[in-house]
Amino acid sequence: MSKRTLASLTAADLEGKRVLVRVDFNVPLDGNGKITDDTRIRAALPTIRYLSESGAKVILVSHFGRPKGKPVESMRLTPVAERLSELLGRPVVKTTDAVGAGAEAQVAATSNGQVVLLENVRFHAEEEANDAEFAKALASLADIYVNDAFGAAHRAHAPTAGVTEYLSPCVAGYLLEKELQYLQAAIDNPQRPLAAIVGGSKVSSKIGVIETLLDKCDKLLIGGGMIFTFYKAQGLSVGGSLVEEDKLDLARSLMAKAQEKGVQLLLPVDVVVADKFAPDANAKTVAIDAIPDGWMGLDIGPESVKQFEGALADCRSVIWNGPMGVFEFDQFAVGTEAIARSLAGLTRKGATTIIGGGDSVAAVEKVGVASEMSHISTGGGASLELLEGKVLPGVAALDDAA
């Protein structure tokens, strides 16, 4: 990675310094305001601990939910501060606002090694607008900047890009460094064969990724609702399945590009169809050329799972982005869960397995094999953009490595 990292800063560089750390604590809450998944908080712990143990004053900044530029009581970061305190085993001070006199006073009262969590930065509309004055106000709280929020690195917002104009050094935290190393290496210098598994409901949201991967990978396995656009493009009847009619030509061109590049492009050979989009729908497995009228495909079938597992068996690197079916409904989660277990098995045999954010992460966690993957990305949109070969503004804004 060509960016300067936290590892380049010693305790002597950090002691007594105010360090602003952009983290991604946008975690899910249940109806009672309890955190249901603290993965993103845990992912930032190595950076927070290193700074704290080095005697820095650690000032964390995160967004949470979509409060649309004004304070919303249910989107305060109080539950996050409480969970972080538990994980660190020490109190975390939460400010009443992200900027302003109150935040300044609370930061000024901070002692070396203490951790402060600024209130939800999205209570200010200026945050997403990357407003210079707002970025300056945030930066005034600190001396050094660390970006450890891969999930927000694809946004040119004040806490990811704007503050870097006013602070020095600006470095990548341990989580951001790991994300970039794994994802960049998977694209630029993978162990081969490299397989990419792309799922999800729409081709349109994955066009850039599929096109880039066709230039990089040896095998491309496609699942999820987007398969029906490919089937229809081949003249097959897809019943009531989801199809993007305006993407049929695109699907044909992607299949042609795969052939031209010598990439093995695999589409499922059978699907699980349902008579309605519901967890209790009637369901049956059919070949892809036998989908009944009015029935919709909601998962890949057992023969497709075998086909995909066979294709993956000799792969040394696998990138997975997007589920194989509607895995929120248990009876249509079988394909996704089988692929998750298959990747865990490949990791045990020495392959590098990368789960590229979003629903695929939820899937491997649901199956209980998250810890068996080589790397789980914390960023959905950011990992997609990096896999597409785009420059992430939050990364570009950091200091270059010496």
Swiss-Prot record:
A molecular function (GO) term: ADP binding
Superkingdom to which the source organism belongs: Bacteria
First-tier enzyme category under EC: transferase
GO process terms (BP): gluconeogenesis; glycolytic process
GO cellular component, one term: cytosol
Catalytic activity: (2R)-3-phosphoglycerate + ATP = (2R)-3-phospho-glyceroyl phosphate + ADP
Keywords assigned by UniProt, alphabetized: ATP-binding, Cytoplasm, Glycolysis, Kinase, Nucleotide-binding, Transferase
InterPro entries: Phosphoglycerate_kinase, Phosphoglycerate_kinase_CS, Phosphoglycerate_kinase_N, Phosphoglycerate_kinase_sf
Protein's pathway: Carbohydrate degradation; glycolysis; pyruvate from D-glyceraldehyde 3-phosphate: step 2/5
EC number: 2.7.2.3
Entry similarity comment: Belongs to the phosphoglycerate kinase family.
Subunit structure and binding partners: Monomer.
HAMAP family found in the cross-reference section: Phosphoglyc_kinase (MF_00145)
Protein name per Swiss-Prot or TrEMBL: Phosphoglycerate kinase
Species: Synechococcus sp. (strain ATCC 27144 / PCC 6301 / SAUG 1402/1)
